[in-house]
């Protein structure tokens, strides 16, 4: 592992640590998403408490947090496993942000952003899967879990060399959703249009 790789890991984590949900809610004078609705600083909760515009801004920024460092590594010719670790570092920053008392989101948008340099085909299929599941069930968390679960299989067909790093990234996201899985199984999970009955 080179010093350049380590520098990119650290940069990805620090970039991921910028909580766009908290900052954008401050700009729009909305409640702190960590203390309102589902208590999750992510685009879905911001949609619940602030509407489409702030939620869209949060989603875009969170995607870029994953895309930028991975794309830099891609341009530098780093191997797939290193790019996977860069993506994981960005997601860890989002999930455990240094600047916000390590209280972050689920990392779904950032993970999507990390996969974006691998090709539009992969990300488009994952977003389509997410939208279909949300439309059918209303559960953002279930849509995220299913989407990242199929991501390694889609990657195998689109960019097989990146299957291992994408799998690592998806495992992290699924582990982060373990409480959501428990609530889904018990019927206590909130839907995307709910005003935050339970944590997201």
From Swiss-Prot:
Main localization (coarse): membrane
Pathway connected to this protein: Lipid metabolism; phospholipid metabolism
GO biological process: phospholipid biosynthetic process
Molecular function in Gene Ontology: acyl-phosphate glycerol-3-phosphate acyltransferase activity
Bilayer topology: Multi-pass membrane protein
Record field: transmembrane: 4-24, 81-103, 116-136, 153-175
Origin: domain of life: Bacteria
Catalysis performed (reactions): an acyl phosphate + sn-glycerol 3-phosphate = a 1-acyl-sn-glycero-3-phosphate + phosphate
Keyword annotations from UniProtKB, A to Z: Cell inner membrane, Cell membrane, Lipid biosynthesis, Lipid metabolism, Membrane, Phospholipid biosynthesis, Phospholipid metabolism, Transferase, Transmembrane, Transmembrane helix
Quaternary assembly: Probably interacts with PlsX.
Family under the similarity heading: Belongs to the PlsY family.
Annotated HAMAP family: PlsY
Name this polypeptide is given: Glycerol-3-phosphate acyltransferase
The organism's taxonomic lineage, starting at the top: Bacteria, Pseudomonadati, Pseudomonadota, Gammaproteobacteria, Alteromonadales
Gene (name only): plsY
């Amino acid at each position: 592992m080179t010093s350049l790789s380590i520098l990119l890991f650290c940069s990805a984590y620090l970039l991921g640590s910028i909580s766009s949900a908290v900052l954008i809610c401050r700009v729009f004078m909305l409640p702190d998403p960590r203390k309102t609705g589902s208590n999750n600083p992510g685009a879905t909760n911001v949609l619940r408490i602030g509407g489409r515009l702030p939620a869209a801004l949060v989603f875009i920024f969170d995607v870029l947090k994953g895309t930028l460092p991975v794309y830099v590594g891609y341009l530098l010719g780093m191997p797939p496993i290193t790019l996977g670790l860069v993506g994981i570092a960005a997601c860890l920053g989002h999930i455990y942000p240094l600047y916000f008392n390590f209280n972050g989101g689920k990392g779904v948008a950032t993970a999507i952003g990390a996969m974006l340099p691998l090709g539009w085909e992969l990300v488009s299929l994952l977003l389509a899967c997410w939208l279909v599941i949300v439309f059918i069930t209303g559960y953002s968390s279930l849509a995220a879990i299913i989407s990242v679960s199929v991501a390694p299989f889609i990657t195998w067909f689109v960019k097989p060399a990146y299957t291992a790093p994408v799998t690592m990234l998806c495992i992290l996201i699924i582990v982060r959703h373990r409480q959501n899985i428990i609530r889904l199984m018990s019927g206590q999970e909130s839907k995307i249009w709910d005003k935050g009955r339970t944590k997201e």
